[in-house]
Amino acid sequence: MATSHFILKLFLVISFCNVCFASRKLTALVQEPENQLLQYHKGALLFGKISVNLIWYGKFKPSQRAIVSDFITSLSSSTPSKTDPSVAKWWKTTEKYYHLANSKKSLSLYLGKQVLVENYSLGKSLTQKQIVQLASKGEQKDAINIVLTASDVAVDGFCVNRCGTHGSSKGAIIRGKTYKFAYIWVGNSETQCAGYCAWPFHQPIYGPQSPPLVAPNNDVGVDGMVINLASLLAGTATNPFGNGYYQGEADAPLEAASACPGVYAKGAYPGYAGDLLVDKTTGASYNAHGTNGRKYLLPALYDPSTSTCSTLV
């Protein structure tokens, strides 16, 4: 269920995405083991009941939107899959960061609003500033606003050095107080760089070559988006404002999932995702069950209690 520290470092050469941040305070302090990979920077972790709002930019089929919305719903322990291993069980690893920080507060996510921007109102080539502009269409308080861009939308840095980003922005003034909201952006890489952002469902653009795996929801682009979204959600929870848990430079850090790139199951090594579960009917590879009978492939998370990459299978 885990990968050694040596393997963890070895996998850094195939990291698929960078992330970006802002800042905020936290009252709880942490006592870290000497061998802890991810350093705690005394900042805030995301806590409380948080709505996850989806802003769809460009054309997505209803079936594609359902893959992502079902994933968000699956994160909640109040609506867990009846089959193990589950998405909710995968998400529980993030709770260990709160325990390590001696925080009595916890995080509860639920699916909020979905906003469709199908008319490409900002064009088909977006800057990071425009991503934040789109993210502001979601809730402004106690929220993670996720911008998902369609396969025909280019975003600054997409496919060059990132598959998505996360950060925070000041929201509207509510009752005289300005709140921050967390945001995530993830792009559909299917027609632009599936080998970079949707591996292992597509042949990698570099490194060891192996046959691509069958995507669990039969959509290479969106199943790849779920992998990157899962990684960024874990980073958002544990390093929402740039001063939580991370290692390295603040503007390009290793976080809870990006510290374990390319690892999805035990036995993983560069070019091989690990010994995954395989659907006997479809041949699809996966490692987590979700709501509505969904199956997903989710990245390993760095477990601060064991200093290893933790996987579900």
UniProtKB/Swiss-Prot annotation:
It comes from the Eukaryota. Residues 1-22 form the signal peptide. Induction: Induced by phosphate. Pfam families: Phi_1 (PF04674). The keyword Transferase does not apply. Glycans are attached at residue 119. One of its GO terms (cellular component) is apoplast. Keywords: Apoplast, Glycoprotein, Secreted, Signal. InterPro entries: EXORDIUM-like. It is found in: Secreted; Secreted, Extracellular space; Secreted, Extracellular space, Apoplast. The keyword Transferase does not apply. May be involved in the regulation of cell division. Belongs to the EXORDIUM family. This is Protein PHOSPHATE-INDUCED 1.
